[in-house]
């Protein structure tokens, strides 16, 4: 019961924070401020291209790199995840971050390298600093769900 209450409080807090952020930004979601779906697709596509070329992390993405079809599918899934995460209308049907990364041995260094790739992609697309910071904070909040420690990899 306690876990349920904590979960409800966390969900309510995130929704309240999201609504507060929209009010502060003239009612526009981060999705809208980033430029909508075309911008989200550009972020996802560019990020996947960067990840697949990044020798620090590409070993975790061999399936995505195994064929053009798999690369495109991964880009589409990532775009849906980003879209949903920044308040867009997309439906994300993929796994949650814990399930998607369980047993993969993702290190803090690998997470940071992907975050660096994302930051460079946002810079290339000339995303304003405020929105870039919000995206990077969202990504940072995912780190505990993605990075594997001895306790989480079991």
Predicted regions and their residues:
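Bacterial N-terminal signal peptides that target proteins for export
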Residues: 1-8, 16-17
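A periodicity- and composition-biased signal for non-globular, repetitive helical segments
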Residues: 8-9, 149
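C-terminal segment of classical bacterial N-terminal signal peptides
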Residues: 13-21
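Core of compact, soluble alpha-helical bundle domains
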Residues: 20-154
């Amino acid at each position: 019961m306690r876990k349920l209450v904590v979960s409800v409080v966390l969900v309510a807090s995130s929704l309240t924070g999201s609504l507060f952020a929209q009010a502060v930004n003239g009612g526009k979601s981060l999705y809208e401020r980033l430029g909508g779906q075309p911008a989200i697709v550009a972020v996802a596509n560019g990020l996947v291209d960067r990840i697949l070329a990044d020798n620090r992390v590409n070993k975790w993405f061999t399936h995505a790199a195994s064929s053009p079809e798999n690369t495109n599918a991964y880009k589409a899934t990532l775009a849906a995840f980003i879209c949903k995460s920044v308040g867009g209308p997309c439906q994300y049907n993929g796994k949650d971050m814990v399930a998607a990364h369980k047993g993969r041995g993702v290190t803090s260094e690998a997470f940071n390298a992907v975050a660096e790739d994302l930051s460079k992609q946002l810079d290339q697309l000339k995303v304003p600093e405020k929105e870039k910071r919000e995206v990077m904070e969202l990504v940072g909040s995912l780190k505990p769900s993605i990075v594997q420690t001895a306790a989480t990899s079991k």
